[in-house]
């Protein structure tokens, strides 16, 4: 077909790569959690409000990371709220309530693109380790365990986590996966 110059259309086609990477996270399907776990997620704020700040600071930093570097990063983030510990409780509580709402919505949250689950072998945050094991088993998603890493495995072992992410992206590029 011939178009007049003023009607010529240039089409640019961009291909977007799609993928899902979960780092020390959990599935949002209600079937993975107990009613008690969801109930507790909805009540983090009042719990954090009555928890002595110094004890919460210690538990938060030690509970999320295995390395000094990871613990110091968590402590530094939390220390931004040192004089506003009630604000920290409010923000954390809000985040956990939103998580509980997403779970209670009972949406399918089906992952239909290439995916990778990453979890620290020493993750002590809630039931993250068991959630990831079940997620891997039920959905068949690849799961990589990070040695000497806790819940913030990307701060405990950043080189290993980055290597896995780069491998995942390279594999998606090689396959030409698009979204």
What are the functions of these language-model segments?
Residues 139-179:
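Catalytic active-site module of serine/aspartate enzymes centered on a nucleophile-bearing elbow/loop
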Residues 31, 49-110:
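Conserved alpha/beta-hydrolase catalytic His-Asp/Glu region
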Residues 31-35, 129-131, 156-158:
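Short aromatic-enriched loop/helix-cap "lid" or pocket-rim segments at secondary-structure transitions
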């Amino acid at each position: 077909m011939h178009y007049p110059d003023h009607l010529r259309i240039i089409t640019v086609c961009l291909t977007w790569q799609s993928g899902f990477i979960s780092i020390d996270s959990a599935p949002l399907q209600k079937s993975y959690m107990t009613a008690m776990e969801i109930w507790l997620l909805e009540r983090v704020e009042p719990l954090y409000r009555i928890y002595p700040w110094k004890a919460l600071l210690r538990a938060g930093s030690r509970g999320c990371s295995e390395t000094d570097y990871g613990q110091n990063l968590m402590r530094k983030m939390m220390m931004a709220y040192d004089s506003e510990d009630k604000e920290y409780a409010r923000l954390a509580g809000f985040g956990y309530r939103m998580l509980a709402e997403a779970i209670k919505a009972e949406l399918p949250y089906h992952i239909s693109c290439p995916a990778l689950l990453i979890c620290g072998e020493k993750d002590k945050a809630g039931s993250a380790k068991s959630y990831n094991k079940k997620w891997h088993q039920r959905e068949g998603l690849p799961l990589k365990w990070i040695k000497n890493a806790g819940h913030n495995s990307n701060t405990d072992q950043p080189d290993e986590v980055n290597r896995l992410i780069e491998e995942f992206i390279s594999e998606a590029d090689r396959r030409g996966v698009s979204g």
